Amino acid sequence: MVKGKVTKPVKKATKSKQSAAMISKVKDDFVMTLDSDGEDLEEESADEKEEVEEKPVKLTKKQKKQKLSEADEELLEREKQAAKAGINPDFQFSLDGFAATSEGLDGWNFEVSKDDNKVQKREVDLDSIIKRKGGLLDEDEDEDEAETDVKMEENEDDLAIDGFGGGVQPGKDMDEPEDEDEENKEEVENEEEEDSDGSDSEAEECMHPDDLVLDDHKGPAIDEGPQDTAEEMAAFYAPEEENNDKTESVHKTFQTLNLSRPVMKGISALGYQAPTPIQSRTIPIALMGKDLVAGAVTGSGKTAAYIIPVLERLLYKSSKVAATKVVVLTPTRELSIQVADVGKKLAQYVSGVRFGLAVGGLNLRVQEQELKTRPEVVIATPGRFIDHVRNSPSFNVDDVEILVIDEADRMLEEGFQQELTEILTLLPKKRQTLLFSATMNSSISSLIQLSLSRPVRVMINPPKQAASGLVQEFVRIRKRDHLKPALLASILKKMDKEQRTIIFVARKETAHRLRIMLGLLGVRIGELHGALSQEQRLQSITAFKKLEVPILVCTDLASRGLDIPKIECVVNYDMPQTHAVYLHRVGRTARAGREGRSITLVGEAAADRAIVREAIKSVSESKQGKAVGRNVDWPEVEKLYSKIEEKGDIVNEILAEEKEEKAMLQAEMEVRKGENLLKYEKEIASRPRRTWFQNAQEKKADETSDKRNLLASNKDKMKKKKDNEEVRMYKKTKTDRKEASKRGKPKGKGKRK
């Protein structure tokens, strides 16, 4: 008994020593204040007592109620502190008072981060070659007086362009200059009725005499094949009665769309006040999970119309397993990069949503590493997407729930048919499909291959219509095709250097030659076409967006989807093939309610005049925008032409020097490639061989057929389509042949001889 009494205090003493050692360790880790030392000692002594007498404490009902009331008081105290800090716990998101577009948003980001391209390819510096040959010297600075005279005359020569970057004073009434222009137009018409080059009159009154012959047949550019019948549309599309509540309701604010708060904050960050008509109609339908075929004019907010419902639906996904839920397909790399930037800005407050990019021309390995993480949204071009699905480890599309096809009519063209068919076989059949385009005029027969399930058809604006703020100017070239480069230089010299201008040409060789020629004349200009590397293309767009280069000459690569802010003018150096392509080109300006103008150089081909006639008809029917003729000072153009002819040899020298430098860079790259093959032979040999759904011969055959179809007339295309749609002739089976032999008839076709 005595031993037991002696041992108990010893255990208590050792326990207290251990607790004291722990307390001293805590004191060493934390710096105590003078006021807190005493409090800590009292708490430590209390803790020691609790350790000695460790007994479970049961709370009575009264104590439980008292504890709950203390929690409520603590919650009220927190709310009071939040109110003092200026935070309202009952806050409801409101977008009232925001501008339609944020002034702080300077367009979308096209710059490629350094991590995406660790190995920077050396490119030929064309500007340095042009400078060595005496170009890019800003000849316009020596001709300031001449330019001021030209600008004074521009108000007389160009009809109805005041207010579109043509010298309107801030605060001046926009209606007054238009009335003055109408009066000036009538005066010029009366004075110059017999002018062979045309006068400053409405383009409808400046038609060529041969146009009257073409009124009966609109020409190949307008012939778009048979239209879908009412029965076919009723059988394919969802009935309108099912969606009247969703499609006909007008949402004046985003609040009425019942979007979540993180999505609303992203919308606010971009400065949107109210949904556009296409957004108001399509967002509710997309949130219902229905398939959608939507069309609206360029610059109407179609990208946000499908990004917003996608983000809203991704908020309710399971966050336990990473999986790709959404795939967005676009026809061009630049459009994919722009869509990714729009999505990231809208999703900046949405947690757990990542965007992946899979486009050609950029670092393949970096994209593979990004897709290994299985981002929720993948934005891609068709070819690179198929490449990653087949060859990138840990990336699959088994969980894809939404497929978005931007610029769907372009994707349904023959150039993308093989890739699109392959992608549809890779994706799950149970999915939602959203189609968006500015000219959604594809027939039902082409939409059937997408496996749409009773899609809802939403067409906001009438087809074949340009933006309401666009002034379309037309210049008749007649038999002066050789003066087109000089005419273009004359037009550009009258432009303000602080305004962005896009020039569309038919061929990349023409774009490159125009850049050199205009550079020799002292015009700062960039180029954008398929012959450039992806880095060069993105650099051109970024320089154009930052106004480092105010003029961009490009092919139809840039005619779809690109939203570069404040493009004042579009010049059609070469006429497009169809009116739909024309609408996509001129849609680069006058976007999102802004104003702009287009200048089109019209040749004598029947297809060219048919497109002009269709544009004028659209303006007269919609009573929006203007279509006018533009006067040209041809003597001045001829002077510029002689100047350009003198520099023809220099242009050829620059092209030859550029070709030599490219050959040198290519040789250096081949040497480095050979060195790497020798140095990393085992690593390269151990990599799995990449596969493709087409071999090189099949791909080349498809490209050849695409070129033939592009050059073929619409009549030949319709004949080929009709032949393909014909019912296949019945073919005899083995059973039929046996029965025929029993009846005494010989095998095969034909009568017995």
Swiss-Prot record:
Residues 487-636 form the Helicase C-terminal domain. A motif (DEAD box) lies at residues 406-409. It is an enzyme of class 3 (hydrolase). Residues 649-729 form a coiled coil. GO terms for biological process: rRNA processing. Residues 283-458 form the Helicase ATP-binding domain. Pfam families: DEAD, Helicase_C. Keywords: ATP-binding, Coiled coil, Helicase, Hydrolase, Nucleotide-binding, Nucleus, Ribosome biogenesis, RNA-binding. Its EC number is 3.6.4.13. Residues 36-51, 137-147, 175-204 have a biased composition (Acidic residues). A motif (Q motif) lies at residues 252-280. ATP binds at A296, V297, T298, G299, S300, G301, K302, T303. Residues 697-709 have a biased composition (Basic and acidic residues). It comes from the Eukaryota. Its main location: nucleus. SUPFAM superfamilies: P-loop containing nucleoside triphosphate hydrolases. InterPro entries: DEAD/DEAH_box_helicase_dom (IPR011545), DEAD_box_RNA_helicase (IPR050079), Helicase_ATP-bd (IPR014001), Helicase_C-like (IPR001650), P-loop_NTPase (IPR027417), RNA-helicase_DEAD-box_CS (IPR000629), RNA_helicase_DEAD_Q_motif (IPR014014). Associates with pre-ribosomal particles. ATP-binding RNA helicase involved in ribosome assembly. The Q motif is unique to and characteristic of the DEAD box family of RNA helicases and controls ATP binding and hydrolysis. Belongs to the DEAD box helicase family. DDX27/DRS1 subfamily. This is ATP-dependent RNA helicase DRS1.
